[in-house]
């Protein structure tokens, strides 16, 4: 009789043992069952570390053995309707508040670091219902452009996350960093199972570049010193919802003002012009900021126009279904071309807004 347990059949005289030794068949089958059960237990014992290791790897790589909340960001509320978050936003401050109004998460990070980490911020908070708020800035053109009320007590409430243009007096005559805002109120971050849950917060760009061009069509040479430019508004102080926290009057003055010639080609008529550039905070469709230009020679007002009304004159030319506020939030560059005669009087028959010619009627001076 020969007995092999290493995967070979049991034999008796060269033939299968179980066929020729029936009296012991039941006993041998019991022994085989016992051996197979032992082998099964041993195999399971060997698999346990592998399973544990696999779960560990999923925990680290796939997040299947834990709960992880990730927040991504996008800035596609622009006239190109394309996400420009990574290229235009440079720094970001994120705040999370629970239903009791307590700050439970606060993080400021460079967008380059966010992109390097996968394009998201991991929220180290328990999955629940939270309100999330963001203030963000673009490239630094003026250090300390804004003051943020974000470092108070955790129980102060999300309403205290306001932002104000940093200034000493009423006037601002320098450029401003691009300012962005994001808000998601009472967002449900709860999870039913382990794994990763990703949310995306859209951002709105608040700041706008206003370029004002004064041209003399008759050929008289204009100098930058001939005019003074300003925009009066009350939008310097915004709350956590991106609305006016209160009327806070501000006057924007040019951070760049120069003269030059329009139409440099020989085939074109050369026209003298003065250009002024200003950066203003968020424009509101229900507000009435005024763009004013003065003749410095005699101090007289050349014109005083409602900036928002004139900005909206060409909204329909973009063939997009937008409310007035949506257009003002998407458009961040406005170019206005005005014409004056030799006496520096405004020729108000027509103007150009963002290269669109507009024929004016019932001009509001």
Predicted regions and their residues:
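Short, low-hydrophobicity acidic/polar segments
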Residues: 105-205
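Hydrophilic extracytoplasmic domains
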Residues: 282-365
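Tryptophan-paired
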Residues: 92-146, 222-318
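A sequence/structural signal for flexible, mid-protein segments enriched
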Residues: 170-268
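Bacterial Sec-dependent N-terminal signal peptides
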Residues: 30, 49-78, 359
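Structural motif
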Residues: 74-87, 213-222
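Sec-dependent bacterial lipoprotein signal peptides
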Residues: 1-2, 19-53
